[in-house]
Structures are given as C-alpha cells and as structure tokens.
Amino acid sequence: MDQPTPQPAYVLHSRAYKETSALVDFFTPQGRVRAVLRRARSKGGSLVRPFVPLEVELRGRGELKNVGGMDSAGTAAWLHGDALFSGLYLNELLMRLLPAEAPFPTLFEHYTLTLQALGAGRPLEPLLRSFEWRLLDELGYAFSLQQDVNDQPVAADGLYRLRVDAGLERVELAQPGLFRGTELLALAEANWEAPGALLAAKRLMRQALAVHLGAKPLVSRELFRKR
C-alpha cells in the first residue's frame, strides 16, 4: 500500500469525537479536508489549534479521512486581540465557503501569508479585504472593478451598485449603499490610502459575500462586535 505523502495544513476547526478522538477540519493546498484524529489528548493532539503550520499525513479514500501523522512545520502565528478575531474570521469564511477536497493551492499560500502579516501586527483592514477578494476570485465569484455590467469603464465620477450575480451597475440617482467610481478604481489598484477606499471595500465585500454565506450569522463577526 502506498504511503500517504505529508502535506502542509492548518486547523480550521475541531471538536470532540467519540471518547478520545477529535474531528478536525484542515485547510491544505488540496482544499478543506475533514479527518479523525485518534487519541486527541496525546502529544499530537496539542497541535490541534488554529494558526499552527502543520505537516499532516491523511489516510483514507472517503470524505472522512484519518490522521496518520501530524507534526509542527514552523512557528505558529500568535494572534492576540483584534488580530485573533480576524484570524478566526478567515477560518470561518473558509469553513463556510470552501467545498470539500477542492484544491486551492494559491489560496492556501495567501492564507499563510495573511496569518504571518496578522502576527506581525500589520493593519487589519487591508489584509482582511485582500483575503476576502482572493477567496471570491478563487471560488469564481469575483467581478471586475474597472468595468461595469455593460462592459463600460468604471468612471471616476460615477455611482455604482453591486449586482452580485453580474457585477457593478452604474446608476444615475443617488441612493443608500452605492459606491463611488473613485473608490472602486482605488480598490482595483489596492490603493488603501485613497479617501473612502477601506470603508467602501468593507461594504463591497460584505455585500458580495452575503449571498454565498446565507442567513446564518458569522460567529466570529459577533465575537468581534462584543469584544
């Protein structure tokens, strides 16, 4: 029988399973994978926590794998305060939106870099907005920030609304929830210093993600509000 190849991974979520085991959701370059970790209270079980880079050996052909081996693969991103809530938010997005066992190697790399940046104390909002956009893009839900639904260039003096199923649509009358063309063009260039860019990015990503997340509130978002 072929020996499974260890692969890099992070723990997204874990919970007790039967008497001494844990059911663990991992994020790997091969996607989100669920596996049973037996003897979860052993030394290996101490690694089952978020933001720790791991090397895991997963066995089995079904959707529910077994952890054959697990080791630390580097220094954990020690997140505190708002950075911790931000990391938990990223994990919850991945748990809610990633299909099981669909490869996302580029997203995995971006996730790793984002955790490192959070641990280094980088400003949170640009990191979160960049990750949300990358996630939408990887899942096939992204839209152009430089062209509207009619294939016209986004105008700096224009007003736009998001049609989640299509993209940005120019409107003539001001109404709540619109985006200025200057803001959208700044986001297209990841120019977070532009006036209104960060706030517009937060509103835009929330609108874009909402339809895919559904009505169930994000636990991490509620925790952040109550901090």
From Swiss-Prot:
Is the keyword rRNA processing in the record?
no
- Annotated signal sequence range: none
Please give the biological process terms from Gene Ontology that the record holds. DNA recombination; double-strand break repair
An annotated GO cellular component of this protein is: bacterial nucleoid
What SUPFAM superfamilies has UniProt attached to this entry? Answer: ArfGap/RecO-like zinc finger, Nucleic acid-binding proteins
Keyword Transferase in the entry? The reply is no
Give the record's keywords alphabetically.
DNA damage, DNA recombination, DNA repair
Which Pfam families does the annotation name? RecO_C, RecO_N
Q: Which superkingdom?
A: Bacteria
Q: Which InterPro entries match?
A: ARFGAP/RecO (IPR037278), DNA_rep/recomb_RecO_N (IPR022572), NA-bd_OB-fold (IPR012340), RecO (IPR003717), RecO_C (IPR042242)
**What is the annotated role of this protein in its UniProt record?**
Involved in DNA repair and RecF pathway recombination.
Q: Which HAMAP family does the UniProt entry name for this protein?
A: RecO
The family database entries (NCBIfam families) matched by this protein are listed as:
reco (TIGR00613)
Protein family membership: Belongs to the RecO family.
Name used for this protein in its record: DNA repair protein RecO
What organism is the protein native to? Pseudomonas putida (strain GB-1)
Gene encoding the protein = recO
